[in-house]
Amino acid sequence: YMYHGGTNPYNPLHTMGETQASPGTNHNDLPHMTYDFQAPLGEVGQVFETPFHEGRFIHQMLTDWGSELLQMNVDSLSRHYARRGAFEFYNDYVRIKNESGTSHVTFKDYRTGGATIDWTTVEPFCKVDDLIYFIEIRGKKPQISVDGKVYTCKLNKQQKAGKLNVCVLSYEKAKTAYKIDGKLLYAKNGGILYKSDSCIVEEVWTKSPVIAATVTEVKKADAPRVVPMGRQAVAAQPVEEDFAKAAVYTINYDTSGINNYDNLFLRINYRGDVARVYADGRLVADNFWNGKEMWVRMADLVGKKVELKILPLRKDAPVYFQKEQKAMIE
């Protein structure tokens, strides 16, 4: 839905986020400001590595095989598998029962290069001339069956599989691989490769010096709110009056000597229900807790009084968390 998370414009009177109380997009509640769906690129432009690379893998596969896939019929559908011609799409994520599920695409009876790929335990990634690149499926032995013969592949090595030339990349190696102008190139520094005009650019996020922030507690939180159910029978977000019961902190920092704040962020690691950050009394960022750090643009904070409010979370709140987050609050 969104490749890059975003932030809604500030409006003291009305939120642009979805809310159960509205007559339109009212399936759930969203924060007042943040509009981040854990997309490949986060709200402030940070790269979420897993969705970024796994989305890129399937986009590259569709670039090279999409025209063939488009002409194939849907053969079967089940809870975990979808078969379309020679492509099998697999997803074993089942909410609650198997939250750390996996997904992948493999070949089944695929005719190419004068041979038939009977099945694979590796994912197709891209084609470069007559060489087919695959990506390992972690936890599985990398094998390709061609014309009835099974070939066990060495990772990151080009080899023959019957009449076919193949190469199975390790998952980590694949994260550095980009097909540009018909060639497979590798990012040497763990960055992102792309073509800009007449050159290939590797963009790398470098670690900048950490600026320590001082956090001072101004007010302790009152008792956690009882989380009611909204119109759609899901947990309702807090109303403005609830934040009078939040824990309040001031945040101070020293950014002297820094002239550009575009790539400088405040990262807040907290546990609770909802967090809000104010600059000179104006709301600039908010967050429904999900176990991850909250990122705030320093450009919105510099030179202003910064205040953090955190609402505590009841352990029995009717909010859905995956098992990893549940363990953090129990």
Regions found by a protein language model. Give the residues of each.
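Noncatalytic modules at the cell exterior or secretory-pathway interfaces
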Residues: 300-312
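Carbohydrate-binding surfaces of carbohydrate-active enzymes
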Residues: 2-213, 223, 243
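Edge strands and adjacent loops of beta-rich recognition modules
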Residues: 223-249
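Aromatic-lined ligand-binding clefts that engage carbohydrates, nucleic acids, or primary amines
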Residues: 257-279, 287-288, 308-309
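Exposed aromatic-hydrophobic patches
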Residues: 251-253, 293-301
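A short acidic/small-residue loop/turn micro-motif
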Residues: 285-293
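Short acidic/polar inter-strand loop motif in beta-rich domains
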Residues: 312-320
